[in-house]
Amino acid sequence: DILNNYRRKTYDIKKRETIFPELPLPSKKEQIVSFPQDLRKIFSLVSVGSKSFLTQKVDRTVGGLVVQQQCLGPLDLPLSNYSVVKHSFFSELATISGIGEQPIKGIIDPVAMVGLSIGEMLTNMIWGVIDDIDYIKCSGNWMWPNVDSYEHYLLYDSVKEVSKILIELGIAIDS
């Protein structure tokens, strides 16, 4: 049996206290000098910059079933809260997709970040017609550095929180 010959991977998970250093405010002169750099940093944030890596994963037009895309307008910007794709030309059923992401909050509190991300996803989808929360399914994407025992702990704690919230809501992760 091929699978029995592989060693099981084990993780050393350790919790530690996170200490944030005091953040000094820059002087007026420093603010003016750093403005272009700061602006570039702001536009590189997922919450502000392009979400094309999230919204352009599939061919959205060939089948003719796309009712609304998350990217809108002549510049194809991801401005819509949700997208809608019909199941067929002969049915009223459709799939609504919404995205929730809160990366900056994850720096301070990863567990709070996952709850806020789920809340954002549901709030974005509320504008589509959903008959019952039982019809909502999630797709989880764990993009985590996972390089040391503390990162393992944060990932484990965050996944536990996702599980707790989705079980309370009756929502499954199916991919």
Set out the residue ranges of the language-model regions.
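Glycine/proline-enriched, intrinsically flexible loops and inter-domain linkers
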Residues: 1-175
